[in-house]
């Protein structure tokens, strides 16, 4: 069993930077672009979290004041002439025209990128309008594109939700792959008395975990490597992507981490049925038992569709406690809300549900609800809690 002090000294984000900071390491350049207020907030959070040397964070916005305070090394004011740095006023067409006006500046900033991850909050003017245009620009420079987007809270109103859906449909036509994260599902993981600031920070946390999960797979060298070509092959199947990140400690921690990743409630209604490719990336101590790792791999192979291409990767570090495992799972080419099974459906039904927890600032461990619990009306779940 790992002592609490040992766990507190283990920082995955910091380890990510230190372990692969060798100047001789030359990987595929990754650009992460935050679009609009929500996307730029994520970039700010990502910079504070720490990024790999091959990852370039870029903040873009039509709101000059908001952009001015962002710590991103690259900042692009969209539509300087058309908006005057005063924002898009919640009108997607203004956001689109602003991105078109700044197309050359965007193209110059990402010209060497092999992978461009675009993150935004859909429903507003800049994020909804500019993001599809920026995706198209990234495609023009030959980069693979992944859009990681959030959908508005229900309380934000039908008009904003409608704009978000329209923006999502447009993104489907251009982006290689899309990860959709509904804000309402993030809200369900929070304490009942969580503040607005805490909830929005959690939205940023989820976006950062998604971005970091993808970039980690191709920037961390390992005994069993997943490289850019593997990701490119997986993203060749256009459609929605599903991603889960799980951690576990103790006996069979690799298998439990896989189950935790599979049971993540934070992604939108999408179906693993029809997914064309699955990438599984493990991070653990060099002395982690091979048998436990092998059993976790067998578990995934047994539950995945026989025609799905499953690629495994593995990275080891002395900084990770010996019985602790972190796993990132990405399934691509999935269909959204088709009535099929979710990411959880590749778990064996007879397996016990593994409760996920997350440590918050006050030291309290919060239970992250499973998909089954999320089907229970909020008021009923609050009463159960």
UniProtKB/Swiss-Prot annotation:
CDD domains: FtsZ_type1. GTP binds at residues 37-41, 125-127, 156, 160, 204. GO terms for molecular function: GTP binding; GTPase activity. The keyword Magnesium does not apply. Keywords: Cell cycle, Cell division, Cytoplasm, GTP-binding, Nucleotide-binding, Septation. GO terms for biological process: cell division; division septum assembly; FtsZ-dependent cytokinesis; protein polymerization. The keyword Methyltransferase does not apply. SMART domains: Tubulin, Tubulin_C. It is found in: Cytoplasm. One of its GO terms (cellular component) is cytoplasm. SUPFAM superfamilies: Tubulin C-terminal domain-like, Tubulin nucleotide-binding domain-like. Belongs to the FtsZ family. Essential cell division protein that forms a contractile ring structure (Z ring) at the future cell division site. The regulation of the ring assembly controls the timing and the location of cell division. One of the functions of the FtsZ ring is to recruit other cell division proteins to the septum to produce a new cell wall between the dividing cells. Binds GTP and shows GTPase activity. Homodimer. Polymerizes to form a dynamic ring structure in a strictly GTP-dependent manner. Interacts directly with several other division proteins. This is Cell division protein FtsZ. The lineage of its organism: Bacteria, Pseudomonadati, Campylobacterota, Epsilonproteobacteria, Campylobacterales.
């Amino acid at each position: 069993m790992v002592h609490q002090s040992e766990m507190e000294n283990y920082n995955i984000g910091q380890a990510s930077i230190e372990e692969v900071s060798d100047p001789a390491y030359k990987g595929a350049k990754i650009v992460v672009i935050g679009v609009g207020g929500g996307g730029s907030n994520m970039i700010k959070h990502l910079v504070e979290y720490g990024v790999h040397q091959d990852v370039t964070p870029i903040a873009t916005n039509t709101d000059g004041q908001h952009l001015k305070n962002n710590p991103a090394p690259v900042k692009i004011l969209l539509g300087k002439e058309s908006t005057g740095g005063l924002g898009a006023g919640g009108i997607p067409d203004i956001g689109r025209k602003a991105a078109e006006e700044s197309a050359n500046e965007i193209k110059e900033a990402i010209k060497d990128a092999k992978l461009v991850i675009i993150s935004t909050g859909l429903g507003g003017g800049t994020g909804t309008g500019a993001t599809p245009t920026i995706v198209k620009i990234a495609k023009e420079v030959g980069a693979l594109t992944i859009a990681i987007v959030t959908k508005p809270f229900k309380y934000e109103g039908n008009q904003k939700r409608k704009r978000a859906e329209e923006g999502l449909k447009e993104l489907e036509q251009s982006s290689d792959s899309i990860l959709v994260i509904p804000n309402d599902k993030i809200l369900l993981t929070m304490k009942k008395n969580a503040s607005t600031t805490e909830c929005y920070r959690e939205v940023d946390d989820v976006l950062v975990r998604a971005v970091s999960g993808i970039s980690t797979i191709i920037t961390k060298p390992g005994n069993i490597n997943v490289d850019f070509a593997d990701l490119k092959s997986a993203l060749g199947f256009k459609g929605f992507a599903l991603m889960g990140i799980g951690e576990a400690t103790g006996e069979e921690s690799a298998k439990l981490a896989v189950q935790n990743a599979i049971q993540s409630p934070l992604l939108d209604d999408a179906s693993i049925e029809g997914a064309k490719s699955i990438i599984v990336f493990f991070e653990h101590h060099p002395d982690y038992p091979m048998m436990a790792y092998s059993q976790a791999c067998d578990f995934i192979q047994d539950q995945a569709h026989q025609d799905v291409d499953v690629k495994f990767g593995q990275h080891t570090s002395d900084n990770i406690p010996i019985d602790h495992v972190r796993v990132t799972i990405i399934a691509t080419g999935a269909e959204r809300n088709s009535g099929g099974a979710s990411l959880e459906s590749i778990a064996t039904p007879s397996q016990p549900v593994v409760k996920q927890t997350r440590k918050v600032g006050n030291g309290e461990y919060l239970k992250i609800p499973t998909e089954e619990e999320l089907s229970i009306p909020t008021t009923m779940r609050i009463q159960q809690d």
